[in-house]
């Protein structure tokens, strides 16, 4: 990619900042925010993909893993294995919200959530966390996705594997080279095995 398309090493949140963000949603007992942030951070879903998620996308692969069967993009279908911790959280959320079909995430008007809704949701947390110096800067949904992809690569996945999983064109994977080479980020390389804690989430909370 062009030089200006290569991400600087400080473009993404480090592991401590990610933990602070998830902890803030966790402490607020905000099921929706916690799950949305987790889907970006752990699975690298785009904002658009999260907003378009339907109950019907959830399935099991031939080995019994819980998956999202994503709609074809450029004639390519993707089956994304859902990590166990997110799968548990997703099951609890769907059950608590009584989602039988259609959109998994709704806005306050009970319509499918829009990309601007998720950005506002994230901003409501980043504003507080920046003020309390628990985040260095305001991050966007795209920034969190960059973090997810970077840590997948740091965790040992090949560029081709990550590109296929996240739906990114392979030639753009080089944009993460500077981040991967960063000593600061590599100190947090154990991010890829961080498990999302579920015990404190209130399953009865409805928004």
Task: Describe the residue ranges of each PLM region.
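Short, basic (Lys/Arg/His-rich) helix/loop patches that form interaction surfaces
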Residues: 123-164, 168
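A short, basic/aromatic helix-end/turn motif that makes direct DNA contacts
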Residues: 52-58, 163-170, 178-185, 190-191
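Conserved tyrosine-mediated DNA breakage-rejoining catalytic core shared by Y-recombinases
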Residues: 52-86
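Flexible interdomain linker/hinge and immediately adjacent N-terminus
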Residues: 1-20
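DNA/chromatin major-groove-contacting recognition/catalytic segments
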Residues: 175-207
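Basic, Lys/Arg- and aromatic-enriched nucleic-acid-binding interface segment
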Residues: 17-45
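Alpha-helix N-cap/helix-start motif at helix boundaries, enriched for small hydrophobics
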Residues: 36-37, 44-53, 162
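Active-site/catalytic core of tyrosine-dependent DNA strand-transfer enzymes
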Residues: 83-135
């Amino acid at each position: 990619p062009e030089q200006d398309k290569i991400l600087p090493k400080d473009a993404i949140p480090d592991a401590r900042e990610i933990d602070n963000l998830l902890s803030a949603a966790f402490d607020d007992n905000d099921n929706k925010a916690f799950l949305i942030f987790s889907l970006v951070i752990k699975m690298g879903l785009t904002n658009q993909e999260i907003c378009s998620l339907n109950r019907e996308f959830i399935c099991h692969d031939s080995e019994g893993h819980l998956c999202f069967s994503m709609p074809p993009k450029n004639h390519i279908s993707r089956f994304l294995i859902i990590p166990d911790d997110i799968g548990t959280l997703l099951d609890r959320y769907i059950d608590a919200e009584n989602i039988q079909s259609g959109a998994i995430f709704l806005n306050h008007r009970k319509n499918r959530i829009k990309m601007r809704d998720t950005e506002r949701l994230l901003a409501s947390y980043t504003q507080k966390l920046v003020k309390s110096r628990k985040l260095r800067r305001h991050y966007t949904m795209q920034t969190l996705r960059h973090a997810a992809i970077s840590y997948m690569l740091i965790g040992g996945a090949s560029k081709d594997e990550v590109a296929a999983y996240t739906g990114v064109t392979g030639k753009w994977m080089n944009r993460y080279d500077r981040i991967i080479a960063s000593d600061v980020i590599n100190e947090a390389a154990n991010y890829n095995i961080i498990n999302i804690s579920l015990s404190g989430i209130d399953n009865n909370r409805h928004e």
